[in-house]
């Protein structure tokens, strides 16, 4: 079945249904009129405006016919179950209660509306174009039940559930109702907006495409069983209720905002679905408050939920782009899940929030974002890529055991955010990766942390049962502490881990457990009962000097665990008591090991400065090692000592000192720079069977020949020199192998004393003296493993068994070498005999094959084989003759290195390997005297001088051969039999050199591929090519003649001969002196390869025929062609069965086409008729590749004909290219035979090429592409191919259709289509943008035209089928017929720009033209548009213009004919319009600029959109029925869109029954409204120019953007006036039920607005208030809140912060002074105790840096804040007497304050300079004291306050108001205390005091905003506080240090703390803005802890203080350093 458009098919069905309905209706009418049916039509038609259902028979209704028209018979209003039709543009009132209307037909009218005055049911509503507005009266309902209607019964047909005619619906009151249901049921779709305060009830699947409640929110939207799809951007209803278990609510708009709550009112939880499918969806109220929903589904986009209650079984994020944001504190009851792809979806909490269920259970979310506030997560599963704490006040608490899959991060300021675990918990990801958290708190239970990064100021274990386990390698940045009871808490590391801070600083932990991995501990204090290494891989590193209090033990398997010390360190307990450690590592410094037990596999010295000393005779169990830089570290033994393990195994120690006595080293490895024998009695014995001593052994006594070295092991080794300073007495090698690595060996004798004795020199060595065998003959082994020299003989007394030469060169200077075998054992082994030598024995390679070098430097003899076991790498023969007598010679290469080099093989021999000349070229002689085999190449590097093959000798060459001469003796044979490679592939072998005596020689080719390169190959008498072998004769060096007294035998059917010119510098020739005979029928292969430059195959005698194969007998099976090959006509190829032209070949032959089969691969085969006409069989030509080319060519100077005997047909479509090349201009190539190019299968391309002519009559072309690469003219008939131009000069005349595309291909050719010639494919211009001309000489159908320079049409009707973006330089009319343009034809180009006739244009369905359409000289004809059509430049026409759809003109429009605007069309003009006439019935005209409209115009139901533009009208115009004017009234300009009727013109509106004026008011500034703020819509220059409609027919709608401005309209003059209504709007907003009635601080906000409203015009206050008019009420309230001042100012915050700073820093200093004063007084009564050496110091200076923060939560609607303070205090004080101290201090503090809640965005920065005087008086010899502090604070405050402004209607932005002012404060504090001395050195000090403060704020004015800069007056106020508390402290003496920890608590009661109101106002306000105030808490609590360490004159302290009040928390940490002098 043919493809049918779905739309076409639908239209056909509709037309069929209409025809059937018409037939049925007609029959029914006929039967009815005849009385056959006996029924009347149940429908009526309204005939007058204001008709009502209750009308009796009168003038408002007529009976209706089945055809849908009035029959003239008056009727009653529609009855129950009737239908009715609008007969005009009427208002109809449904005023009969409970009436059921089957259907309503709007028909072709523009109805004013349907008023529902009584409960009414309406079935379907259909229309002919316009929509029916409906208004439902308060308390009444409209039910849509979806009934259908049929023409026979109702006068029109309407399908069920069809409301395409229903427009906007207005609900007239709170209980006006719209009910949507369907009897079917089926889906009902409503297109219009629904407004009003009523109720919508949906009982079926329904879609509401418009907005709901946009102007006036609905009371309720009820969703019953079904899917309610709300597609509008605005849905406003108090509650949207899901009333049925099957209820589904879907919001689809990209920016949907549902204002109100969504609830499940079924009474059953967990039913009902909410789908939020838009990119930005918003629900402002609670969800599921009454009963939980089943699902909230968030699609691709962000859902913003503003309710405090969200209840649903699951809130699902279903898409990668899903996100949900809770904008307020919320309780989410249920789970939040990602049901899309893993690691997508974002959940954001912006206040204190709770989620009761799991998060990300199905798939992990991308992000959980926690803003300012605490997120309490109760689920057992939390899965998200990252849980982010984004604010200083962010906190997350997991209230149950939980698995948190993903990371937890602080993305706000560093060291903020709290994470609390209250049960067994797991976190899989990092914590604090971006910025560190403040605290990780672990309660009772185990916290399992899996991240690699844990960053928090402190990780606190707060309970006896607290435990934290790090399951992966981790870096813990911060401290780990036990803040519970001492010796509790467990920390477990299970991977490589780092802790940067102390562990157990507050209280010791029970256990630090180090599992598999390294624990790097950076603290100076590590306190734990036991530090346990529990795993084989456990390790702990102390990175700083440390005191480890407690034991270190290995509780795992023995000999595991590592302990590392990196400074002077002390361990108080045992090490390895339970099980030995693997390693004790000692870094830079001295390790003092205090335990009674030291057990470790290895004690490692890791640093240059490492040292360990064993002071007594010791047995060290384990090894001692240096793992630092080599040759560092000292171990000292001072008596008889034993070490059971190795010493210096990793790196050598610097020194091992052996004193008097025997040092028995049992380890296999001893490494030290020097092992020193320091005493005459020193003896060093290595007992290990495999002892290796790395380093030197020296005698440092100063006396030669003392000291003994015994190498008693089976394998002993010394790597360094022996006896370098003073010689040893003896080196004795017993039964075993001694390996000596030194370069100096000094001993009288190195003796091999045993049959099993062996000595190995492992490094280059000079052995001065002999090496001898003093035992039995043929025993003893000497091994050299580096470059070595032996100056004497080897084996002189008795022959050695073996001399082994390892890696390196052994130089033997002696003339006698006796050894059973000299073994070359290594790849780098080499032996050089430096003098003539007789080697008695064999030379062998016992290492890897093809390694080892033997060099002879004079006449030499070897009696045995060489390389018998494995081939050597090289036998090198220098100047002289090497006589080799062995039958086996194996070496990779035997090299002749000198001009005088020669080698003679004296016996038949197998030479395994190559023979090569590595000296000068053409030197060296090789002689074979018997049948010989050489497995490798001969002469590979350089050609040899001569290769002699003796008489009768057969030389088998296993490789290539290259010699200057190859001399054959009589009856000699050279056979090449080289193997394949390891993969079974042929290796190309070569045969190079001049052949002497070749006439007697035989060449056997028994290798797969052999190439001969010398022209003398033609002299060899016989060449035999073996089975499966290929022999090549290459002419690269010059021309070659073959077959001259020469036999070439193909010994098998698969033997092959190659004739080639692979590397020749030009085209070379291979000439045949005779026929080349095939071995049999279809046997043998011949290959021609032209190589780089080409090969000619011809006869050695010109004109003498030579045959390749026998035409009538034995033919060669295959001829293969490679590269460029030309066969001369002398050589006949008919003796070839198959010709294969391979890839990239260029084969030319005029004889090959008679071969059996010709197969063309990706190559070219040229048949040239240059010598005459040709008859080509053609059927034997095969295209084996899609790009195979066949060239039929005439390159002669004559006309030629090529006659085809058969079709040229590829095997598959789109394969093969045929090029027809007529080379010579004026000459012709004729293709005869009447055959087809591309028969059953089409060719890929047919190319016409050349400068000559073509004759193709009778020839058919079946191809994909026809390419025109010609310079002349060509005429083609019908073709299915694509046609492509390749030359600018192409001139193609197409006489038949083109079935493919036509491509100008960036060429400026011309293609002419004859009449009725069509192009089925695209006309395009690949690679170009403005090339080529297409001329259509008559009618034509074109598919798509794009990219060409010119299209000429018009001689006949032309249709272009496809549109889209089209570039045509110009379309020109060649006649006045029609050019039909397809849908969406978007032309970049012009029409009739440079010429052309009046071509008619028909835009079928939209499009555009970028250039001019016609000019004054070259106008176009008729213009018809439909769809969206636009013209970017001027339009000039002289026909009839019919404009439909949406048509826009960006430039002038001129038409000398009539213009008709189609019904429902929209036409937009941007510049002047000129026409004869306009008809605009039911059409819209938009004016985009002020312009002149010059034309008569008539219209009915016309809409004119003026905007703010003036239309100057010239002509005669009249409008009837409805006229709609859309205008814009610009308040700033005090003008708007209007029509000015020019003098002499008229505009008649008297026939307009409804003048609808729609005004959009913009830029209305209340400051500029005056009596002249008005404008007139239509005016005339002369009287009578305007004929108005009666004023009662004028209806005005005003769209206003400023809530504080309203308008009035004078219908008689069409004039609009503006007025200020702000006062009333404010009252309504705050009245009961108003949007701002119940907001926080409502009274203050209202008062603020009233003050601003009362300000004078032009003032800042009035300007800001005007801007608020663009906001919604809630936005307005927020903006006002940001202006109003809270009672708590930055100065109040600073006062609190500064009081805490002073109290903490100075008071702590006074505490220390009090302690010193007590000692001074005590010292006056008795002696000074230890640690009190500073008693004479009377003065002190101190410094105390500090950091702190404070948080105030929101209180009584007053915004909270967060402050951060840093700074420092310096002070100086002194004793005035023993009882009185006075001091002064200076404090600098910098504080950042960030406000929250209503003031979010406000920030303050404060610089404080505080100057203090302080004093302490202690009653002599009593415990009573009094302290006093007086302070002055100078504060510079910079504030940045957010101001809210309206940027557009109901859209806000922000500006920043900047303030800069000073605040001063004066504070005095007096405190008294009494110290009680308690047991155990504990002091208890009760304290009581008073504090008084005065604060003075300076006045200032803000800058930075447009109208919202406040002027703030200064204020003064006082505070008075009482203080009561206690302090506990104790002095602890630790050596010379006195530690004083203290804890204090204080109650602060404010007797006076009331803060005065703030006077802040905008310019123009007569009174200040109200101040938001609350009653501040009276009571707060101060708690602090600190510790002071005193050492002599220095004191060091650290303190932590907190201040806690109602919703207030502040904390400060400080350190202090004090020096007393």
UniProtKB/Swiss-Prot annotation:
Gene Ontology cellular component terms for the protein in this record: cell outer membrane; cell surface; extracellular region; periplasmic space
Outcome after substituting residue 1877 to I: In strain: Indian tick typhus
Pfam families hit by this protein: Autotransporter
PTM remark: Glycosylated.
InterPro entries: Autotransporte_beta, Autotransporte_beta_dom_sf, OM_autotransptr_brl_dom
Domain Autotransporter intervals: 1734-2021
UniProt keyword terms in alphabetical order: Cell outer membrane, Glycoprotein, Membrane, Periplasm, Repeat, Secreted, Signal, Transmembrane, Transmembrane beta strand
Signal peptide bounds: 1-38
Family matches, as SMART domains: Autotransporter
SUPFAM superfamilies: Autotransporter
Family the UniProt entry places it in: Belongs to the rickettsiae OmpA/OmpB family.
Function: Elicits protective immunity.
Protein name according to UniProt: Outer membrane protein A
Organism of origin: Rickettsia conorii (strain ATCC VR-613 / Malish 7)
